[in-house]
Amino acid sequence: QQRALFRLVLHNREHLMAQMPMRICHPPMDIDEWQNKTGSDPKNWPWSYHNGGHWPSLLWFFGASILLHEKRYPKADVLLMGQMRALIEECYWSQLNQLPRQKWAEYFDGPTGTWVGQQSRTYQTWTIVGFLLMHHLLRAEPDDVLMLDLEEEF
């Protein structure tokens, strides 16, 4: 199941990662569905906030799942896992280059996550911590991902 999810993300990479990884839901609700379900909440218009916005703090969850899968199953689908590793590296560098300049914004709007969210708060703890966790797991202590293994017996 996990590898099927990884393949799905790769297949939809352009939409889910785009310029600011990672989109919170895909596809976003269209105008009619948005009006009916949210009462035309301006924060949740299509491609924004919880309706297709990009939330950088989500990347560490996804990255950790890839790294943990590599630890658990080092010989499983090596080609796929190589592609997934390359994807999280690319996303990491994207965030490293953008987030400090964009004041660690909470979320990003638009089909590609190009714009800082219309009501986004800056210097968000979860944005900063999410990036630092991804950095820690990729660069500092990769084995620390094992702390997140819920199937491991202690």
Region spans (language model):
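Active-site core of glycosidic bond-cleaving carbohydrate-active enzymes
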Residues: 1-98, 137-140, 152-153
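CBM-like carbohydrate-recognition segments
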Residues: 97-144
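A short, highly charged, low-complexity intrinsically disordered segment
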Residues: 144-154
